[in-house]
Design a protein with these regions (language model features):
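Acidic low-complexity intrinsically disordered segments
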Residues: 285, 377-531
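Conserved phosphate-binding catalytic cores of ATP/NTP-utilizing and phosphoryl-transfer enzymes
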Residues: 1, 155-186, 358-375
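Phosphate-binding loop and its immediate beta->loop->alpha context
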Residues: 20-153, 159, 223-265, 269, ...
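Adenine-nucleotide phosphate-binding core of ATP-dependent small-molecule kinases
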Residues: 84-106, 110, 275-309, 468, ...
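Short glycine-rich phosphate-binding loop at a beta-alpha junction
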Residues: 115-132, 312-330, 515
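Glycine-rich phosphate-binding loop plus the immediately following alpha-helix
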Residues: 37-47, 200-243, 283-304, 422-435
């Protein structure tokens, strides 16, 4: 079976390919009620980690829980050992991710609408996994690694807004013409925002550019509503302990998701705290929207580079030349404020997906379906470069290696060695030691220095001096970045350095690997780059 798996900040949605249709999987909760998602929640139930609906049931019994642990993946210095706080317990992030995907896979086999169709003896279902367009290498690696450890056969990883473009083309093919074959996917999820401009020619899709904000999503709207509820209750944020604050956020999330265009008031129960009892308060929806408008404006500011060259003012708003539509997807985009503000600016070209929370999962299922015939050329979406020592270690220079606009391989066609993008550089080393500090970044300034979101990827030490290479031989297996310890060894400039080759490979999932080779001695290091 071919699955599309949209790992969301608050909800995880799965769709599957079924003879040209792509239904969303329904999951059963503890009461055998059906839902079109699996909750992205973990709880500590008497020492055992539980996930999904079981975690929600444990949370209702007062057990400590954590929602939105996916957001930790967007932190600049995230590692497999980054900590998820579940009450007083600290659990490594990779352990939580793997446990979550394992619980999801078990639910698919035992408590879902497709349980009878999954072959338990045939290994994991063929799965295409979604990832935010601006996710760094570590986020991609950890998501992929956890999913594979849980037993899924991951055959591809597709950027979420690119996947939503497949769902748009599948559902609204008639809106795409030779004059209007551009689509802007506006993807506002629970924790991230991405906007991608795509050119659609039949089943061939190409990403022309993409921008986003790694930490902006539905969780932030929940905090705005929680702040308004506290104000209405006459309480202060510091009066609520961690678990009480988490309970209030959960209450606000449920209240927010129940809003309709006709809603005028929203009711929230503020938990007991600091000697005060629980209190039910009412917040005017207009007041909530006024406070949340700046969040929506932050998304339109982020996508401004996409629309600037296409925009022309009209009486009805901004007309976008050649654009068939701005397609609104993502669970947080269901808030009525979002399409209202976008339509006020862009007019009738704004189309909200009829299934905003499931659009990406459906698109991923289309990508997983070999018979669908879609192809995709995406962009790297974030720059990749290296800080190097110069002037005998007295200064540092920055070298951009991979531009954010780099066209990557066709991730839908399936991984093979031919699908990898390779960049090779050769030079004569000028020092006895090379210190490579690799980073990913969102932009560079006029001087070529990285700016905006900056995420360290790995520090690698490479001895250029043959004597140091003999003293520090590599292990047989691929060494971890930084495993060659030359701490305290002085950096010396030399005139007779070896010829060095740097070979960078970007796989279809967007994960970067580097091979460093001294072509004179044959000494080599190979690393898959992630923190």
């Amino acid at each position: 079976m071919d699955l599309g798996l949209d790992f969301g900040t608050t909800h995880t949605v799965v769709a599957y390919a079924d003879r040209g249709n792509y239904p969303v999987v329904a999951f059963l909760d503890e009461n055998d009620d059906t839902h079109d998602h699996f909750p992205t929640v973990v709880a500590d139930d008497a020492g055992a980690l539980v996930y999904g609906f079981t975690a929600l049931e444990a949370a209702r019994r007062g057990m400590p829980f954590a929602r939105s642990f996916k957001r930790l993946l967007a932190q600049p210095r995230v590692t497999p050992d980054s900590v998820v706080h579940i009450g007083d317990r600290n659990v490594p992030l990779l352990e939580v991710l793997t446990g979550f995907f394992r619980a999801l896979r078990e639910a698919l086999h035992t408590a879902s609408s497709i349980e009878s169709r999954l072959d338990e003896t045939g290994g994991g279902p063929r799965t295409v996994l979604g990832v935010p367009a601006h996710a760094n290498s570590t986020q991609r690696f950890l998501t992929l690694e956890a999913c594979r450890r849980a037993g899924f056969e991951v055959v591809g990883m597709v950027n979420e807004p690119s996947a939503a473009s497949f769902e748009f083309a599948h559902r609204q093919a008639r809106s795409i013409t030779s004059r209007r074959n551009l689509v802007i996917v506006y993807d506002l999820g629970g924790g991230t925002f991405d906007a991608s401009l795509l050119k659609l020619e039949g089943t061939s899709h190409e990403v022309l550019d993409s921008f986003g904000v790694n930490r902006l999503g539905g969780d932030d709207f929940d905090e705005v509503l929680a702040t308004a509820a506290l104000r209405a209750a006459g309480r202060a944020r510091d009066e609520l302990a961690g678990e009480s604050w988490a309970a209030l956020l959960e209450e606000c999330r449920e209240a927010k998701e129940g809003l309709t265009p006709q809603s005028r008031r929203v009711t929230v129960e503020v938990p007991a705290a600091a000697g005060a009892g629980a209190r039910v308060v009412t917040v005017a929806v207009d007041d909530f929207y006024d406070a949340a408008t700046s969040l929506v404006e932050a998304t339109t500011a982020a996508m401004e580079p996409l629309v600037r060259s296409l925009a022309s003012p009209t009486d009805e708003g901004t007309e976008l030349e050649g654009v068939a539509g701005i397609y609104i997807v993502g669970g947080a985009s269901a808030l009525p404020l979002v399409p209202r503000l976008l339509r006020a600016r862009f007019g009738r070209r704004v189309h909200r997906s009829p299934m905003p929370s499931a659009s990406t999962a459906v698109g991923l299922a289309i990508a997983a379906d070999p018979s669908a015939g879609f192809s995709l050329r995406d962009r790297l979406s974030r720059g990749f470069g290296v800080f190097r020592e110069r002037e005998g270690g007295a200064a540092v220079s920055f070298d951009s290696v991979l531009d954010r606009s780099l066209v990557t391989s066709d991730v839908v066609a399936g991984p093979s060695s031919a699908d990898h993008v390779v960049v090779t550089r050769r030079y004569q080393a000028a020092h006895n030691i090379g210190w490579f500090r690799f980073v990913e970044y969102s932009a560079v300034d006029d001087q070529g220095e990285p700016r905006g979101d900056l995420a360290p990827v790995a520090d690698i030490v490479f001895p250029f001096d043959p004597e140091l290479q003999r003293v520090h031989p590599l292990a047989e297996e691929d060494p971890a970045p930084g495993s060659v310890n030359l701490e305290g060894t002085p950096i010396i400039r030399r005139e007779d350095g070896p010829l060095v080759e740097e070979r960078y490979t970007v796989d279809p999932a967007g994960i970067i690997a580097v091979s460093l080779t001294d072509l004179t001695t044959g000494y080599r290091q190979e690393h898959v780059l992630h923190a």
